[in-house]
């Protein structure tokens, strides 16, 4: 991470007590500084063999309960999140010299939440959720396009319902770390650990 680092210091007495509120304020700054996909994050899951896998997805919602993303539950990340319900998230906002890491348990969002978000998506994305056998082998692009055409024909002139295999996951955090770049690699790191229904804060060596 090579970047021009502005002077910044957040002493322990200044650490906000609520990591979700701190994330919200930082996320607003990221949206002002980054034109494309400031909500992009790396999601890491783990398979039956203990091998981790990671990919970039988009954060779609967050609140005190956790951080939400949507996907095909038969995709690799969907299968792994259901079988081993823990995940790690990582946001990196280079213009801000900021990184946020989130770790926690994974739970499925409610059907009402998934339905509401699915209906807000562009129709092409709704069709794609039916047509794509996400993470499965694909012989040719034409095969995918044929499946898209089939779904478009099936739902022509009517709303596209949410597929039963498509929903959201909420990562319920028990650890959130904020990192701010400093000169000489002497970065600021503050971790929040969930304890007894609240949060304990701790500074970390860089």
UniProtKB/Swiss-Prot annotation:
Its EC number is 1.4.3.5. Substrate binds at residues 60, 117, 121, 125, 185-187. Binds 1 FMN per subunit. Catalyzes the oxidation of either pyridoxine 5'-phosphate (PNP) or pyridoxamine 5'-phosphate (PMP) into pyridoxal 5'-phosphate (PLP). Its cofactor is FMN. Keywords: Flavoprotein, FMN, Oxidoreductase, Pyridoxine biosynthesis. One of its GO terms (molecular function) is pyridoxamine phosphate oxidase activity. One of its GO terms (biological process) is pyridoxine biosynthetic process. The keyword Oxidoreductase applies. Pathway: Cofactor metabolism; pyridoxal 5'-phosphate salvage; pyridoxal 5'-phosphate from pyridoxamine 5'-phosphate: step 1/1; Cofactor metabolism; pyridoxal 5'-phosphate salvage; pyridoxal 5'-phosphate from pyridoxine 5'-phosphate: step 1/1. Homodimer. Gene3D superfamilies: Electron Transport, Fmn-binding Protein, Chain A. This is Pyridoxine/pyridoxamine 5'-phosphate oxidase. SUPFAM superfamilies: FMN-binding split barrel (SSF50475). It comes from the Bacteria. The gene is pdxH.
């Amino acid at each position: 991470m090579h970047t021009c680092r502005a002077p910044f210091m957040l002493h322990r007495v200044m650490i906000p007590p609520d990591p979700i509120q701190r994330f919200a304020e930082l996320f607003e700054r990221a949206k002002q500084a980054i034109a494309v996909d400031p909500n992009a994050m790396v999601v890491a899951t783990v398979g039956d063999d203990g091998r981790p896998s990671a990919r970039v997805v988009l954060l779609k919602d967050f609140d005190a309960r956790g951080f939400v993303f949507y996907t095909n539950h038969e995709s690799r990340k969907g299968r792994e999140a259901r079988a081993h319900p823990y995940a790690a998230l990582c946001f990196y906002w280079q213009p801000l010299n900021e990184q946020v890491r989130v770790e926690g348990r994974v739970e499925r969002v409610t059907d009402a939440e998934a339905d509401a978000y699915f209906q807000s998506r562009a129709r092409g994305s709704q069709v794609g959720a039916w047509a794509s056998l996400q993470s499965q082998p694909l012989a040719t692009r034409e095969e995918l396009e044929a499946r898209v055409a089939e779904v478009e024909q099936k739902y022509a002139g009517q709303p596209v319902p949410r597929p039963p295999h498509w929903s959201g996951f909420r990562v319920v955090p028990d650890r959130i770390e904020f990192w701010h770049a400093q000169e000489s690699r002497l970065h600021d790191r503050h971790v929040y650990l969930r304890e007894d229904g609240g949060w304990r804060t701790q500074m970390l060596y860089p």
